[in-house]
């Protein structure tokens, strides 16, 4: 019967073992009659099958490039090393879905993707040097947008949902933010200043402006965490925990002082990123 799926608009086929009856769902009543006639002509007794009209065909489960997941290099359809982290999902002005990560992840690569899929050639990505961010459009293999950080291999069994994003003028001084990255996994820091400028070592001298400066201790961000989500955990009492997106990780500087060692992390603001890339942040529950 598998060769006739399209001919008879078959949605599903199953067996009720108790009654030894084959259950078939098709999309239209006309196809139901045609299939019934076909089965009877092949010698099947009418009591041996049950045909149901179901106009809705099952749809494949969506594949997501989730915030906090690893960004990989791809060459000729072969996955390479993981070099950065997804910050958030977005949609561009042409209606194309994709994810945002650090612009400097593009410097020496030709294709970027996730574990399962090569998403885009770098030439198809939209980049903003002044916010160290880039939009990587999805290929046809990824079918859904998501605001859910859900990677048990990196962040344990806790899931987080990006439900909103901060405005560029939000006063976050003194606020504790949580970062997600493929190397350090999860780290926290306190915002020291809400508008700083800096240039990336090894870059082209472009000045990144109006970024958050965050002081981290204990576990600190490291290589590969670039582009990753930085957010305020809004409600840890619910599942998934809700969070407000502040920006993505761009760079770090290590300091040693008499009071101890610490790291400053620099976080371009989400609103500046979406404006520069002309994309819309997606926060949702998938």
Descriptions of predicted regions:
Residues 20, 29-31, 56-58, 104-107:
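Short acidic/polar capping segments at secondary-structure boundaries
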Residues 5-41:
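Short glycine/threonine-rich beta-strand-turn micro-motifs
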Residues 62-286:
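Terminal interaction modules at protein C-ends
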Residues 45-56:
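Conserved short beta-strand edge segments in small beta-sheet-based binding/regulatory domains
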Residues 1-2:
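Surface-exposed, low-hydrophobicity interaction/linker segments
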Residues 18, 29, 56, 91-93, ...:
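Generic structural motif
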